Amino acid sequence: VKRRVSYPAWLKRSLVVITAGFIGVNIMLPPPMAEAEKSSPVVLDKDGQWLAGFTIDAGTWRIAADLDEIDPRFTQRLIAIEDSRFYTHSGVDLPAIARAAQSWKRAGKAVSGASTITMQLVRQIEPRPRTLPSKMIESARALQYELYYSKDEILEMYLTHTPYGGNVEGIYAATQTYFGKTPEYLTDAEIALLIALPQAPEARRPDRNPDMAEKGRNRILNKLASEGHITAQMQAEAKEVLLGGSRAPIPEMAWITAYGLAADSGPTQTTLDIILQRNAEQIASEFAKKLPGPVNTAITIVDNKTLKVRAHVASADRQRPGGWIDMTDRPRSPGSTLKPFIYGMAMDDGLAAAGSFVHDAPTRFGSYQPENFNRRYHGDVRIFEALRHSLNVPAVTLLDQIGGQRFENSLKSAGVDVTRLGAGGEDAGLAIALGGAGLTVNDVAVLYAALANGGKAAPLTWKPNTKTIATRMMTRASAGEITKILRQAPTPDGRVPAWLVKNAPAISYKTGTSYGFRDAWAAGYTDDWTVVVWVGRPDGAPRPGETGRLAAAPLLFDLISALPHSGTQSHFEKDAAAPKGLQRVSAQETRGPQILFPPEGSEILAEDLGASSRGFSLTAQSETGKVTFYVNGKPVPKDSGRSVWRPEHSGFYNVTAVDGNGLSAKSRVQVLTFDDLANAEL
């Protein structure tokens, strides 16, 4: 029969008191979990790449560690050096304490330490003087931490708080600062240095004391080799690595954007793409160097298929006046960038079609009388011409029929926050067509992405797994017509038209200039991307002569050309299929003339005008060989056997070619002068 062991009553009472006391202290004085888990906010791209980070606690870099993203050889060797029984003790290593006490007794001073990784973590979070009472408190706290956290969580917190010299804490900040990389893949020399540094963080800083850092590193290499963790060859090769040099900068891409998206602590993943972000920032920075000091630019780039923001430049240069302001989020007058949506809504209402005519002449709408940008008028023009050349009066005419408030409501239903810049009332409502209301760069990106998506608008997304609801702004057919018109807009000066460049994406775009030349805009899209550019002064000061076409469109085209494209390269729509029941036939026996110059929809630059000008030689191809030209119904006279047309003024003209069989061909063209180009707003 087993004899029952009986313990003294005083021992039982003591155990109860000690247990109750520990539980009471644990409840009343829990470990500072908030401080233990606090780390620098870090913003990541869509694939987890580091875009930017922010310091905490008087400028400290402390990046949260993740064991899955740290070289496992580092953690194995760290534990071997610092706390070989880490995974078996409960926060306090009693054999290590006994060994340290015996060493101290023999040598008369501390020879080996007894602090576990958990105790070191306690000291990092709650610094205390190096005294015996402090050691006892640290031991108690270590036991607490072991109750609250798993071993891996403790190790991650330790690798988050470990000091590495200066304002650097944690393995992530250390590898970024001293090696310019993450801790996922480390060399033997780097591992040894990272183990040696926390033992004397300031004395062994490689950027300030490379000799001391090398001695500490080599001491760790010797110990690792003696204990069989590395070979003699690995030891020798690691010792050959030189130390020194300046600290690598912490990444700060999309800095202003990241600041707005970052959580209070720890990592925040975004939809940004680090490669596209880097390209956009470089292009914007080079562009900004050519701008006067107070002028800046802002950019939003959106993936049309997902509406995720892939690149975002809140300010091209933070060192300029107002450079710390996110100019993509500030309401500014959008100029003419809303005109495509007026025409699209008019098409939906049956008020207009791409080829229908609208009158362009001085017109008063109540007390509001808009003017064209260059104060010239063209009479009856087709809708596609009015939009392509950004005529003001036709846009306001259609908006008056649609209703200014109704149009504004359609923008708001798409998620766009319309800000009135002037006084309310009917006049302000119609003025929205010409920039009389404030929109942000991000708002304009929502609208143009809707055109790219067949008329469906939805909010932009900045973080993964964000759910949004789409709203139809216009029918797919109307969005397609608008896209076709904007796709045929002339490219910025000095650029080869995209349709002449192999594999160049088909770009639909519109520019805008606010009243007083305060804001220059360019918004464009391809099948894959929507890009919106703003250029101006953050203080809203005017920049005379700086239109959207001159100041913003070149940057838009630079950005789009740097993006990857997988969509259509088609620049002009094919003829629509014949309605059901009809058949396309080709008249092979008798073909009418074909106008070679000027082609349909072309713009012709005239050096001079009138009867004394050089004029333009009109040419056509015809089976009869004989062609007579008419411009606006009047015959064009012959000059040395050629039909030479000498326009009297700039504007739109109808050119007709009639052959010997009486068959004809027509083209509608616009004549421009150098003055027109100087005052152009497209």
Model-flagged regions — what are they?
Residues 106-130, 184, 246-260, 352-408, ...:
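Conserved catalytic neighborhood of penicillin-recognizing serine enzymes
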Residues 49-63, 173, 202-206, 258-264, ...:
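Short pre-catalytic segments that frame enzyme active sites
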Residues 48, 78, 121, 154, ...:
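Residue-level preference for non-acidic, small/hydrophobic
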Residues 270-291, 300-301, 312, 319-328, ...:
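A penicillin-recognizing enzyme superfamily signal
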Residues 2-293, 304, 308-310, 315, ...:
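Juxtamembrane regions of bacterial inner-membrane/periplasmic proteins
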Residues 1, 23, 230, 238, ...:
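Soluble, non-transmembrane domains of envelope/secretory-pathway proteins that act on or interact
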Residues 38-40, 296-299, 503, 518-520, ...:
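Short loop/turn microsegments at loop-to-beta-strand junctions
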Residues 82, 86, 105, 125, ...:
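A generic secondary-structure signal for well-formed alpha-helical elements
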